[in-house]
Amino acid sequence: MNLSKIIVLIITTLFISLSCTEKEPDPKGTPEYIAEIQQWHQKRIERLKRDTGWLNLVGLYWLKEGENSFGSSEENDIKFPDNSPPKIGTIILKDSLLTFKSADGVDVLNNDIKVTDLELKDDLTGTRTTLATGSLRWYIIKRGERYGIRLRDVESPILKEFKDIDIYPINEDWRIEATFIPYDPPKQILIPNILGTTEEDNSPGSLSFTKNGKNYKLDAIESRNGFFIIFADETSGKETYGAGRFLYTDEPDSNNIVTLDFNISYNPPCVFTKYATCPLPPKQNYLHLKITAGEKMWGEKH
């Protein structure tokens, strides 16, 4: 066979291969519904990029009882990134009381006002205290009995690198009506987290739904205006994050019907940063179902 025939054969084979490549399905649903989900996704991207979003987390440091000095110098109890002052100050933890004292010559701001000595409120109080110097922002988180510093850098390089999150094609078939089955009394369920610990949470009931002729059930957690669902499925660890995804719903209607719209299921913050403390799905919320809706994995971690 001469060279020209070999080249033609190769080109033909490549053409056939590309032609046989499975095309991703088009969005399915009314134009209004598709636009609604696209708008939700765009707002999700914008929230991630905000100063309060998950993309700019650059540190998580657990505090010990007593004094905890921090800054970029190795001499501190806690070493901040190199773009911070050598010593920013000290956080004193005494029982559950936290106090910040700044180092000399360092401008630390709270609500744009310079502070040198301040009592700190953690994130679970609803009135957390945020401190700032330069492009760094930090506040106290409480997880169980532990207190830690969560650090952000509003000029973190990832903010420039981050563009979007892949999602499955929008498909209104994944907008499913579920029946809310109350627990009386509410059931205590175990919620593991990425730190390796487990906490109990109240589940007011389960959400029962049918897909492809099979029945499935998810334990719900009460949220401000409805339910919060942490779930994993047969895409987890393959096309989506291995530790599951999150989904919020509205409250049940008068017939105890709740809409589960898996097109707005999304990645937990641990996908984007190792400094988040994500809850994981309770074992009963691992579904033997491939949910091809919502956000796919971001980055290389599964």
Predicted regions and their residues:
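Forkhead-associated
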Residues: L63-R128
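Flexible, glycine-rich surface segments
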Residues: E177-S236, Y241
